[in-house]
């Protein structure tokens, strides 16, 4: 009785909200509302490159496969199997035959895969071309078989595209055009579109056509944007949301000792860093970059602002990632004396340089306090810092387009580090840092051509060492994610910070 009353209360509350927007919910629905600090800006599955939206689109439209973080292995989704042929330059995917589109249409075909790739590569709004930097073309062999041909042998193709490359219907695009993502957002994933409002919510509902049945999983998932941490915690305690993500350490005490909520902490594969773009002065001088890296007292920030809820990084690889064995010996340690010496060598013995440092506020755990602390640390060794904290959407757009010289940010879903490191540090892949180093480029290419896992990891560790030495970014920590969860919800202990909703249980 009590459990059904709780579910009814969820349903009644959200039904009132959604009736206002033309999307009523049934009282018997298992409705799970989860907070979001990330971008909720578009329904177009190719117009954004953000971790949370990738998770949504993969579960609505379907991806060829995804990374199972618990198994640390790639598993199929729309594809039932894949093989490497043609001396490592072709990945052949075989699609499942037991799927139907959420509007009752046919299952996914090779033509849909080719269409989706063409959308990414030719649509002017696409933000995902970097996913296919290694791809020459994609060819339909038959209805169920598709070949992805790479420019050179590429061992990391699944890491490049699994969980991110959403497959959309060629048939619906031909009938309804590009705007069909608003009017006919139908796919083959375990959930389907229900409702959307920019910077407010994204709502998905179970797809009854999905073959695998999980009756305890939520029928409806509501992503509700809440950037203020106090608001997230209050909403959880009031049962307005059932999962409050990114609870800052200083608010954990509000959740302790409550029988109706629980704290679910987990390690993270999101790497937090400060970027220094070598395309902008004074960051074109490696001595200035390393001076800034030595100025940051990472351990003090972890203890005082994060209250120990973070794992320090020496370089870009951490304990929850593939290929990690130990930190990079070349990583800059806190050493303000060394920072001042490097600035003097670079011509700033009498003060300066003047820099603008950018950060979000409310996107990451305690990001305002952390960015203020970093700015003060830079000033203490001689930098003249102006701290800029624009709205997250504006900052993210500027970073993606290479317009921010120095910033504090995170990169999520870095289980296999090759993709994220290539995205930020390989020449021509994206302009986010505008770092270019032929030696590092060669290592990335060598890693892609290496199919033996340990040999590939050894090459990626060389990349990590070179980045730590050259300091286009100072890698700081991976957060220990703190989730506040209602006691009737079983939340997976997943280092991605996101959820595969069929794995969530509501009682």
Roles of regions detected by a PLM:
Residues 9, 94, 128-172, 195:
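Surface-exposed binding/hinge segments that line
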Residues 29-32, 197, 206, 272, ...:
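Detector for C-terminal structural segments
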Residues 179, 208-254, 376, 384-386:
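Ligand-site clamp/hinge motif
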Residues 35-86, 115-118, 184-188:
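N-terminal lobe/hinge region of extracytoplasmic solute-binding protein
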Residues 80-126, 147, 235, 282-284:
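Aromatic- and charge-enriched surface segment that lines or borders ligand/interaction sites
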Residues 283, 312-346, 363-369:
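Structural transition elements
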Residues 38-54, 77-79, 105-106, 128-129, ...:
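A structural "hinge/loop" feature
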Residues 68-70, 162-216, 220, 230, ...:
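Gly/Pro-rich hinge or "lid" segments in bacterial periplasmic/extracellular proteins
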């Amino acid at each position: 009785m009590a459990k059904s009353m709780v579910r009814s209360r969820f349903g009644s509350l959200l039904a009132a909200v959604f009736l206002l927007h033309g999307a009523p919910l049934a009282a018997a629905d298992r409705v799970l509302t989860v907070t979001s600090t990330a971008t909720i800006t578009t329904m177009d599955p190719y117009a954004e490159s953000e971790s949370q939206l990738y998770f949504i689109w993969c579960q609505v439209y379907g991806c060829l496969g995804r990374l199972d973080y618990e198994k640390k292995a790639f598993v199929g989704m729309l594809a039932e199997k894949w093989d490497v042929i043609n001396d490592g330059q072709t990945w052949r995917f075989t699609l499942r035959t037991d799927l139907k589109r959420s509007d009752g249409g046919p299952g996914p075909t090779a033509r849909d895969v080719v269409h989706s790739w063409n959308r990414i590569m030719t649509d002017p709004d696409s933000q995902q071309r970097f996913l296919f930097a290694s791809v020459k073309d994609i060819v339909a062999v038959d209805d169920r078989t598709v070949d992805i041909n790479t420019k050179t042998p590429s061992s990391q193709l699944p890491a490049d595209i699994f969980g991110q490359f959403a497959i959309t219907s060629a048939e619906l695009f031909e009938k309804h055009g590009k705007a069909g993502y608003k009017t006919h957002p139908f796919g083959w994933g375990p959930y389907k579109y229900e409702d959307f409002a920019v910077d407010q919510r994204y709502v998905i509902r179970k797809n009854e056509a999905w073959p695998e049945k999980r009756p305890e999983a939520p029928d409806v998932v509501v992503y509700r944007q809440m950037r203020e941490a106090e608001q997230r915690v209050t909403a959880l305690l009031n049962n307005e949301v059932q999962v409050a993500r990114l609870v800052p350490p200083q608010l954990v005490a509000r959740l302790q000792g409550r029988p109706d909520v629980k704290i679910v902490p987990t390690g993270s594969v999101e790497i937090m860093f400060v970027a220094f773009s070598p395309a902008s002065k004074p960051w074109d001088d490696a001595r200035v970059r390393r001076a800034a890296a030595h100025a940051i007292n990472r351990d003090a920030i972890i203890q005082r602002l994060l209250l120990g809820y973070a794992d320090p990084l020496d370089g870009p690889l951490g304990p929850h990632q593939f290929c990690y064995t130990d930190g990079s010996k070349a990583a800059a340690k806190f050493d303000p004396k060394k920072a001042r010496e490097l600035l003097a060598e670079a011509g700033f013995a009498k003060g300066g340089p003047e820099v603008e440092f950018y950060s979000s506020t409310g996107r990451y755990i305690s990001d305002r306090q952390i960015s203020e602390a970093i700015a003060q640390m830079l000033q203490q060794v001689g930098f003249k810092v102006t701290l800029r904290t624009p709205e997250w959407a504006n900052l993210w757009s500027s970073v993606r387009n290479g317009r921010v010289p120095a910033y504090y940010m995170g990169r999520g879903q870095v289980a296999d580090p090759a993709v994220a490191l290539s995205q930020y540090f390989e020449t021509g892949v994206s302009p986010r840092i505008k770092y270019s180093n032929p030696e590092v480029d060669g290592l990335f290419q060598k890693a892609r051509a290496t199919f033996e896992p340990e040999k590939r990891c050894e090459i990626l560790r060389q990349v990590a060492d070179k980045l730590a030495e050259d300091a286009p970014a100072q890698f700081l920590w991976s957060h220990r994610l703190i989730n506040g969860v209602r006691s009737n919800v079983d939340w997976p202990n997943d280092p991605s910070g996101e959820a595969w909703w069929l794995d969530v249980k509501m009682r």
